[in-house]
Structures are given as C-alpha cells and as structure tokens.
Amino acid sequence: MRIGIDAMGGDNAPHAVIEGVALYLKENRDDEIVIFGDKNIIEEECVQKVQPLDKLEIIDCKEKIEFEDEPVKAIRQKKDSSIVVGLQYLKEGKIDAFVSAGSTGALMAGGLLIVGRIKGIDRPALTTRLPYKDGQYLLIDVGSNTDCRPINILQFAQMATVYVSKVLGKKNPTVGLLNIGTEENKGNDLSKQSYELLKSAKNINFVGNVEARSLPFSPPDIVVCDGFVGNIVLKLTEGMGLLFFDILKDIAKSSFRAQIGGLLLKPYLKRLKGKYDYKEVGGAPLLGIDGIIVKCHGSSDGQAIFSGIHQAKAFYENNVLALLKEEITAESEV
C-alpha cells in the first residue's frame, strides 16, 4: 500500500508528521509512504527519524495552504501546495490514500474539485469518534455541511453504517438522529423529514431520536446530524474534557490531603484522560469522496499522525470505498 502524507498540514508540522511516519514504518515495513511538502525541510527531518528510507518518497511542494485561507480559492490558486499535489496523486492512482492534519475546508474542497465524489452521493461528510461512558460512538457530520437536506442526513447514516461495520467491526450498528427530544415529532422541518427517511430506510438500524444529554452515557453507535450541530457537539465535548481535568488539577492542589489523593488516583485518571485523547483516534475519514482521505486533528502530534495513517490503512484493507459505492448504488435503484 502507498499512503500519501501532507507534511505541511497542522500546528506541529512537519516535525510531528515525520515522527508519525517513522512510528508507522517501524511497524509496517511492507507499505510505502509518499510525503508532500518542502523537500529540504523534510529530508533533514527524515534522515534523523525515519527508517527504512527506501520506503519513503518525497514530493517537493513549494506552497502551503494555511488554515485562514479561503478553501476553494486556495485549492484553485495554490497548485503546488502539499494538499493539492497530494490529492492529485490520489486522483491519478499514484497513492492509495491521503492523510493530512491541514485545513478541513481545503481538504473537503480539494476532495470535491480534484478527486470527486462517489456517484450518487449528494454531499460528502466528515466523521469523528467521541467518547462516552463505555466506549466511543461515531458522530457524522462534524462540520463539512452546515446546511443540509433530509437526503444528506440519510446518506450520512448509510455511509457511516458501512464504515462502522467494516472498519470498526461493529455488526449492524445502531443509528440515532440528534434532536431536541426523543419523540418522533420533535425538532425542526429538517429533523422531522430526516426522521421519516431514516425510519423507512432498509439498510440502516435506525433507533430514533437521541438527545444530547444522553451522548456521554448511552448513545447509539452512530449519531447523525448536520455539520453545524455536529461541530458544536465536537467542540463542546473537547472543551468539557479539558475543563474536567483542569478542575481535577485545581482540586488536587487545594490541600496536602488532596495531593495525596491525587497521587493515588493518578494512574486511573491517566486511563480516563486517554478516552478523551484525539491522539488515540487518529483521524476522521471524509466519507463520500471517491478516494480515501483521512483528516487528522490540527494539533496532532506524532502519535496522532501514526493513528491517522492506520485509519487510512484500515479503510483501504477493508475495501470500504467499494462497499460505499455498492451501498449507494443499491439504494438509488430501490
């Protein structure tokens, strides 16, 4: 497998990206990595960190898409950027997957303009896994589509079902629609119309509406919503996790007795923190694009990049792209 990596994307690029590549190649010596970015910087980093070097190819790219760049404009104007060149390689079949911690908007715009969408998909969507009491659930969409139609919500659920069952190994995953109440008639027009489509769909295990307050305790395997709501849920979850541990730190420092208690609880709190750590999840696939694209967190370190590359590998090895095409084609013929 040949995996493309955007070396210039993310707050900690290119150092964290090269660290992630080095970790990955230590465990996956049969795969090849193609790195896109400033060759002079990348070569210096790779010589120090990456072995074996013969499994590495560097494609020199002189431009970089910044987080503040307007996505579509950047894709059209920065032709020699690591994202544009990497996606072009993906389109031409020179790599099997592309991983980036760069601009989400640019990745989505580039995926649509360069790689293209799966036939029958109205809008691709971005997913992520979020923690709850007993594990993780998949949230879709988390920011790609702030305005949606009911057909978009249905297709998000269909794509997520294939991904969760084939990559994450959850048979017949449950699907819930994020709403302001559990009753069937709750919500705005989008929610009500989406509910009817989801309820009548034969290829998903729809369990009804789900409220936000149940997400930390007993969510379905997949929670579907528009990207505006999904991004708020994502950012709030990240923020609450940080707040929780900041409060614990303050309490642990409040007295000598609290410090002793904190030391005793430290290994257990470390395990708890791991559940909220995006580094372990790695990345979020862009479902609906006609190619494997994995978006890593903008603040990714080497471990997060390593996990993101593994996400791309699992997507590829489980033939998820072909399965998504089959699913959408079958549904459109009904």
Curated annotation (Swiss-Prot):
It comes from the Bacteria. GO terms for biological process: fatty acid biosynthetic process; phospholipid biosynthetic process. GO terms for cellular component: cytoplasm. One of its GO terms (molecular function) is phosphate:acyl-[acyl carrier protein] acyltransferase activity. It catalyses: a fatty acyl-[ACP] + phosphate = an acyl phosphate + holo-[ACP]. SUPFAM superfamilies: Isocitrate/Isopropylmalate dehydrogenase-like. It is an enzyme of class 2 (transferase). Its EC number is 2.3.1.274. Belongs to the PlsX family. HAMAP family: PlsX. This is Phosphate acyltransferase. It comes from Caldicellulosiruptor bescii (strain ATCC BAA-1888 / DSM 6725 / KCTC 15123 / Z-1320) (Anaerocellum thermophilum). The gene is plsX.
